[in-house]
Amino acid sequence: MAKEFELNEVEVWDGNYAASQALRQAQIDVVAAYPITPSTPIVEGYGSYVANGYIDGEFVMVESEHAAMSGCVGAAAAGGRVATATSSQGFALMVEVLYQASGMRLPIVLTVSNRALASPLNVRGDHSDMYLGRDSGWVQIDAFNAQEAYDMTLCAFKVGENHAVRLPVMMHQDGFTTSHKAQNVYPLKDEVAYKFIGDYQPVDEMLDFTRPVTHGAQTEEDWHFEHKAKQHKALMDSRTVIDEVFAEFKALTGREYKRVESYMMEDAEVALVLLGSSVETAVLAAKQLREEEGMKVGIISPRCFRPFPYDMVRDIIEDSPVKALCCLDKSSPGGAMGALFNEISAAAYSTSTRPLMTNYIYGLGGRDFAVDEAKRIMREQKAHADAGHITTEIQQFSGLRGPKLGFFETRRS
């Protein structure tokens, strides 16, 4: 029987510790992990809970992140509630097994403290690893601060383990900016948190010897297509479950979450779209510009990167007077438009208004995104809206040292 962990009504936790506390409250059976900056404190925290008797689960220390996710796959297939944590190069090493986990429909929870991918080597936060996982078949949920890192980790178990979903879930938080920043967090009592998540009810667990099953079977052109189509459908169908889980969490805590968060969009003529901790910076900048210059600025932030909430983004754009929309990607685009820009463009294309769309690459390797820079971008969007066309390159690098870097101009007759 696990010992009780004393919690105050308000704790001062960073995002990593908040996530580790959520893992403890979920009473996980197995964590298989290989530590890497900046997510190390998550698994360190879990290891200390096990060592000190605060949880009855197993902490398996392995030789690599590939082995960590492999261990998670085995434990989940055996019928356990399983989680781990990683970042950056560790995430990259896991990628092969991420596809195994989702293809086998195993509801593992992976807490990711986002960090830049080498080379050059960098331990600071951007969204390179988050974007790397976008086609892996996992649900991806984003936290903007430490409170949300705690809340979203709890929700991740309830979403992934739902029998209508049965898919693994990533909970993303910005490395250092969220993972290491201490903030007020309002935790649930252990029994309340566990009741919210519920007992794990595995499906087709391998340790049920009365009902032998096969996991990870080989399929070729005869059935592979159908398997992947069903997996995609399950991911898309999870949208309803995510909404239901968020609604239940609101009823329990009063904290409301949506698959897409929007701020001041009702009358916004220009808007920024971005992810993670930068959302709070952008909201502050928008409020200041509204007060100082009367500029009608709004913010859109998808909380669920997968399944991507195209319908909700479309409705937010359609229901606002927005004329210019800027998508900010915190990852090197590698010779193309940013991933967030591409997703938002798909949603915006289905609207009748079709606002002007631009793409900013920002914050790579942890480069600071300041309020003044957010205001500069907003003013540039206002210039586009006033002119009725994009007055700069469609894609620009924000906060870059040296000459301005931009690509792809619109053609005007």
Named regions from a protein language model:
Residues 168-261:
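Conformationally flexible catalytic loops at phosphate/diphosphate-handling active centers
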Residues 329-413:
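Peripheral docking tails and interdomain loops at the edges
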Residues 124-168, 172-175, 353-367:
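Conserved thiamine diphosphate
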Residues 47-52, 284-299, 349-350:
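Short helix-loop-beta junction
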Residues 12-19, 247-270:
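Glycine-/acidic-rich phosphate or pyrophosphate-binding loops and their flanking alpha/beta elements
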Residues 42-45, 71-74, 94-98, 119-125, ...:
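Short acidic, glycine/serine/threonine-rich loops at helix termini
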Residues 1-132, 137-138, 154, 402-405, ...:
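Thiamine diphosphate
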Residues 265-295, 308-315:
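Redox- and metal-dependent alpha/beta enzyme cores, enriched for Fe-S-associated oxidoreductases
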